[in-house]
């Protein structure tokens, strides 16, 4: 692990001096000042959102990574300290490049470890409730009835998580099949019902057929403008569709009010760069820039005593992708691809705040 931190420290020195980071920071400095009157007017309804360290106003979100993971999966007891230290280092790197808010979409996280992380950093951390894909969920989640599942959502959204006063600010559900399985339909339906009651947004894991997820949530009463669908650009989930056909599906979701979250920056093995640019550009050119969200989707987990960062066991280069990557690499690459500073501000500042408001 010492080698890991040495590598990361070297990267942070490089980032501090790099032209890419300078471009990203220059862009972010042009955003609305946090709490400004301009921000108030832009975001319309202002809400207070719970974070790990108290509530914040949506107008104070600033630069937001809307789909991340501080920790992922079960953390072995003897790996807790190194896991927390690793997460803290990555969050502090994000702070240095101008990121203000991280939305964590690990809905069955160990809140105790998250408290340790939050106590050592200054940016806002919004946590989630809900569930991930079935095979990765414990029996304590998969064996819940629909009413019990809804009760869990309500408790973590209104009272606190695992006996703490820390509340979730968003619901996360996941589909890993198309069509959705009976269990997936149940948790999506439960999420839609609690969302209706509490006016809390929903994020989904949507590699396969996001339109089916969108239609099912809306059928069960969800406000389409408070839904976002993650990983829709992952080509292996397109089911044989061309990028043009997939683009048409995303346009239909956007026309219905839904948002898309793109994260495969630097993941050409899942989404060729030209396809990623095509899909984001298609939404923007058709008047749906306000429906585009971007994030890094970084995570790390333990496998047989080894820390796997992103998918570096198969693609070693992905170890270099951290929260900061969105600013140091993805933003400059988007600018080179022809997106404007206003586009980037929409993806990272305006749209996340409006989505939660």
Regions found by a protein language model. Give the residues of each.
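N-terminal secretory signal peptides
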Residues: 1-13
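N-terminal export leaders
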Residues: 10-28
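C-terminal segment of N-terminal export signals and the immediately downstream linker at the start
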Residues: 30-58
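Alpha-helical scaffold segments that flank or form the walls of functional sites
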Residues: 61-66, 71-124, 147-167
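Divalent metal-coordination and catalytic microenvironments
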Residues: 67, 102, 195, 260, ...
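Active-site gating/metal-coordination segments in enzymes
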Residues: 116-119, 125-201, 252, 259, ...
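Active-site core of metal-dependent hydrolases
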Residues: 197-275, 312-324, 333-337
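Short acidic/histidine-rich active-site segments
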Residues: 263-264, 288-312
